[in-house]
Amino acid sequence: MKKKFLAIVTAALIGTTAFASVASAASGTIDVISREDGSGTRGAFIELFGIEEKQGDEKVDMTTEDASITNSTSVMMTTVSGDENAIGYISLGSLNDTVKAVKIDGAEASAENVANDTYKVSRPFNIVTGEKLSDAAQDFENYIMSADGQQIVEDNGYIKAADDAKAYEQSDAEGKVVVAGSSSVTPVMEKLKEAYEKVNGGKITVEVQQSDSTTGITSAAEGICDIGMASRELKDEETSENLTATEIARDGIAVVVNNDNDIDDLTSDQVKAIFTGETTEWEDLAK
């Protein structure tokens, strides 16, 4: 379900940029779709495209007040797939044929291009833990970072974090592990959970709870979950809470439009102008 986001920010003047040529553009008002405030994908997106601007001592999210807000990757995809004038952004690893990813600055959104740094719009997938991990949670983390776990990461379209990982060695731990947070990290975490539970023969069960990155980090800090999931780096105030972030994968952020939209390529400046509300009509991209 989408709703209008009423941001308490001031308008910013964005410098004139050279827009990429669009041979056959869509027409009508651009329907901007964004994620909720606690989303790690949103946090990384606004930083990478310069939508977050420094004003005094604070960083301000300049996402247009006209944007509609979705609260998960799946809802974002459903919203964009059902609206010919929509534009949004999702985890590259979650991309399927219900929406179309546009090239950014001429680079296709693909795991290969993220790995070779041709596609610049990428961010880490982190697991977040407190000072003390249960034996069961430590064993699951060991599996994620093993060669076995990292192969699952790669098989599901993400960039593995550890090229020299060693094979998983099962411990004697038993119990339950609760993992909570980012909706972008959730799909690959579900795959890791499934494979891990087969390997350990049911001695350790894993429960994955989907929310957003900020909720996952907070839950890990407060001991509500064993492991938090975040699709962004920790903020300064979060690192001071004795939390440790471990990168388990790298993922691109795909800028997506409806499959019936003729636009295939946007510049970074165009994306910024769209999401800050400077560009509001699809026809303006062809000028």
Language-model segments: what does each one mean?
Residues 10, 19-287:
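Exported/periplasmic ABC-transporter solute-binding proteins
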Residues 1-10:
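Positively charged n-region of N-terminal signal peptides that target proteins for export
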